[in-house]
Structure formats: C-alpha cells, structure tokens
C-alpha cells in the first residue's frame, strides 16, 4: 500500500505541473498571435476640450499600432461636444492629428456638434472625416464588435 501512494502522488503532481504549463503558455500569446486571432477594432471617444485628453487619445492610438502592428488594428477617434475644438484648423494638436491620419487612424467630427457651434468643414482640419452624430457612431461601432475606449 505504501508503494502505491508515492506513485499516485507523483502522477497527481505531474498532472498539476502539466496543467500549469499549458495554461501559462496560452496566457503568454505574443501580440502578433493576438492580432492574427481576429480583427482588432477600437473606437475612441473624445468629448472633452482638454489638450491633455487629446494627447492621451493620440498616444493610445500610436501605442495600439506599435504593439499590434498598424495593419492589425483599425482605430477610429470620434470627436463631439467640447472635444471638437481640437479638430479645428487652429488646433494645438494639428500636427499630431495629421500624423495619426497618415498612420491610418480615422478621425471624425460630429456634424451635430458642428451645427451647434456654427462650424463648417472649412473651419476644420482638411483631412478629417465626418459623421452625422458622434454618439450614434460610437454606439454603432460597439454593436459591430468594436472595443470602446475613452481616454
């Protein structure tokens, strides 16, 4: 009976070690493996007129592209309310917005907010896009499976 107990204990220990190794390996997928697992799509809300929030959103977009690979992630930044001000031609972050657009980030302005603030496309940065309603765009993206981020 004493010879059976160490064999059973040893077998149980081996099963436990194998389980831990299997789970640990699965948890340590590389970013490239995660990117190939399916589409990475992120919609970001910027509704604050705070320069810091815009810089944070642009940093998040850059970091997502750096970690996952720009070809492996689709990013859309939706600006509405007070956040729309940073998309105007005189924006303090105009050069960073241009860099993000060049790298493939989609940046859109809410036309409802533009009407409320009496802004025309000629008042805005030339390369941005437009959506009818920023909150509806965010809602629809989430319904389509996009991850939501609000910096």
Question: Can you say where each PLM-predicted feature lies in the sequence?
Answer:
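Bacterial N-terminal signal peptides that target proteins for export
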Residues: 2-15
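Bacterial N-terminal signal peptides
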Residues: 13-24
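Secreted/extracellular ectodomain signature
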Residues: 25-151
């Amino acid at each position: 009976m004493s010879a059976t107990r160490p064999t059973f204990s040893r077998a149980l220990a081996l099963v436990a070690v194998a389980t831990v190794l299997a789970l640990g390996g699965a948890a340590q997928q590389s970013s490239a493996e995660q990117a190939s697992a399916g589409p990475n799509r992120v919609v970001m809300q910027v509704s604050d007129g705070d320069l810091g929030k815009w810089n944070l959103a642009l940093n998040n977009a850059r970091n997502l592209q750096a970690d996952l690979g720009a070809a492996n992630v689709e990013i859309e930044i939706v600006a509405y309310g007070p956040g729309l001000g940073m998309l105007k031609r005189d924006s303090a972050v105009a050069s960073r917005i241009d860099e993000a657009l060049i790298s493939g980030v989609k940046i859109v302005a809410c036309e409802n907010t533009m009407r409320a603030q009496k802004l025309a496309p000629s008042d805005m940065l030339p390369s941005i896009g437009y959506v009818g309603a920023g909150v509806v765009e965010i809602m629809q993206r989430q319904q389509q499976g996009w991850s939501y981020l609000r910096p």
